Curated annotation (Swiss-Prot):
GO terms for biological process: tRNA modification. Belongs to the methylthiotransferase family. RimO subfamily. Keywords: 4Fe-4S, Cytoplasm, Iron, Iron-sulfur, Metal-binding, S-adenosyl-L-methionine, Transferase. It comes from Aromatoleum aromaticum (strain DSM 19018 / LMG 30748 / EbN1) (Azoarcus sp. (strain EbN1)). PROSITE patterns: MTTASE_N (PS51449), MTTASE_RADICAL (PS01278), RADICAL_SAM (PS51918), TRAM (PS50926). Binds 2 [4Fe-4S] clusters. One cluster is coordinated with 3 cysteines and an exchangeable S-adenosyl-L-methionine. Residues 10-120 form the MTTase N-terminal domain. This is Ribosomal protein uS12 methylthiotransferase RimO. GO terms for cellular component: cytosol. InterPro entries: Elp3/MiaA/NifB-like_rSAM, Methylthiotransferase, Methylthiotransferase_CS, Methylthiotransferase_N, Methylthiotransferase_N_sf, NA-bd_OB-fold, Ribosomal_uS12_MeSTrfase_RimO, rSAM. Its EC number is 2.8.4.4.
Length: 443
């Protein structure tokens, strides 16, 4: 919840759930409301109404969203619902018919209109209350930079295109203008996100825009080069493994952007990948990983996988483990397959029992632990730059270029009580465990 106190203007509470892309949507809504003079309340009791930005990607997310709506209704009584679950308004209204309004994802205008209807805005706007970078829900030193909306893929387990539509890329000058504003406000790290980051500009046929008086194509490699000129960390997330991704690796080796790729491979059995409607040439993927690391040895690769997908046999799962052994990925997340209403995968034969899905997920994560630890051990004894997150009497917690916020590990600095949150620092790595590095500050 976000808090700003005022006794003279209408107050809106806000609950933001889901992925970083939803966080960006929440920030846009909050910025619009603040610009119109609404105050942002940090409590249900103090708010005149509450907006809940939902997630609907898997069943657990739907349940969490419905619970959050119910809590807001119980504590406040006036609730507007938006976000991915909002695309299924029948589900929301069946559970909570008393909500004031329901909109889908990426619907700032519709949310603001609903707020106007149920809580009329002040007569005069208060644009002076808005910082140039807008309202943000992340710490001051990093920000998510969303470059597109929607997705052109039709992965059989996913319903994102039905909720957020096909790919719509933001004009490159808009992206760069926002990035510059964020950096000017003190942001030290830009996390580039979308549903399909690699496809940026495909829908616009890589149209040429302009930034700082020079032409700039609406294409990921060109955007990455431009962002790399801003003097901050630039981290790439949700990178679909197109061949064009290869172009990013030299930029990472040169230090223009962080040597970090978040690539959701999802599986390694060609048969299961075909059923998922994902690229299925596993040998090609392994060869590309080897090539990436030959160009940029410090590259960190994060990926996610699904266990227990319909039709997955013991041999399919063993293929996945063999892939992990060969690929030596740095960071891995795994999800037991969960049927999502409306997903094509629901119609596939041979569903895997729930307990087997979860058992395979746990086996995969246990298998990956040794690999992740070995990948971290290579940093011991090296001097690295970290971005400090928190400092207290017991020391500091930071992140390295290999660690995205909330999903990866940390750098623990026991003697770091003199460091400054939100600033870069030089440290020497002294030890590691499965997820985290340990370090001491350098003079």
């Amino acid at each position: 919840m976000t808090q700003q106190k005022s006794q003279r203007v209408p107050r809106v509470g806000f609950v933001s759930l889901g992925c970083p892309k939803a966080t960006v949507d929440s920030e846009h809504i909050l910025t619009r409301l603040r610009a119109e003079g609404y105050d942002l309340s940090g409590s249900y009791d103090d708010a005149d109404l509450v907006v809940v930005n939902t997630c609907g990607f898997i069943d657990a997310a739907v349940e969490e969203s419905l619970d959050a709506i119910g809590e807001a209704l119980a504590e406040n009584g006036k609730v507007i619902v938006t976000g991915c679950l909002g695309a299924k308004d029948d589900v929301i209204l069946a559970a909570h018919p008393q909500v004031l309004a329901v909109t889908g994802p990426h619907a700032t205008d519709a949310v603001v209109k609903a707020v106007h209807q149920h809580l009329p805005k002040p007569h005069d706007p208060f644009t002076d209350l808005i910082p140039p970078q807008g309202i943000r829900l992340t710490p001051a030193h990093y920000a998510y930079l969303k470059i597109s909306e929607g997705c052109n893929h039709r992965c059989s387990f996913c319903i994102i295109p039905s909720m957020r539509g096909d790919l719509v890329s933001r004009p490159v000058h808009d992206v760069m203008r926002e990035a510059e504003s964020l950096v000017d406000s003190g942001v030290k790290e830009l996390l580039v996100i979308s549903q399909d980051t690699s496809a940026y500009g495909v829908d616009m046929k890589y149209r040429t825009g302009f930034w700082n008086g020079r032409p700039l194509k609406t294409r990921l490699i060109d955007l990455a080069k431009a962002l790399g000129e801003l003097g901050v960390w630039v981290r790439m997330h949700y990178v679909y493994p197109y061949p064009s991704v290869d172009e990013l690796i030299p930029l990472m080796a040169e230090g223009k952007i962080l040597p970090y790729l978040d690539v959701p491979f999802q599986h390694a059995s060609p048969r299961i990948l075909k059923a998922m409607k994902r690229p299925g040439n596993v040998e090609n993927v392994l060869e590309r990983i080897r090539k990436w690391r030959s160009i940029c040895p410090d590259l960190t690769i994060r990926s996610t996988f699904i266990t227990g997908f319909p039709g997955e046999t013991d041999e399919d799962f063993e293929q996945l483990l063999r892939f992990l052994e060969e690929a030596q990925l740095d960071r891995v997340g795994a999800f037991a397959y969960s049927p999502v209403e409306g997903a094509a995968a629901n119609l596939l034969a041979d569903p895997v029992p729930d307990e087997v899905r979860e058992e395979r997920r746990m086996r995969l994560m246990d298998f990956q632990e040794d690999i992740s630890t070995q990948r971290l051990e290579r940093w011991i004894g090296r001097d690295i730059t970290v971005l400090v997150e928190e400092v207290d009497d017991e020391g500091a917690v930071a992140r390295s270029g290999s660690d995205a916020p909330e999903v990866d590990g940390l750098v623990i600095i026991p003697d770091g009580d003199g460091l400054v949150p939100g600033e870069f620092a030089k440290v020497r790595v002294t030890d590691c465990d499965v997820h985290d590095l340990y370090a001491r500050p350098l003079p």
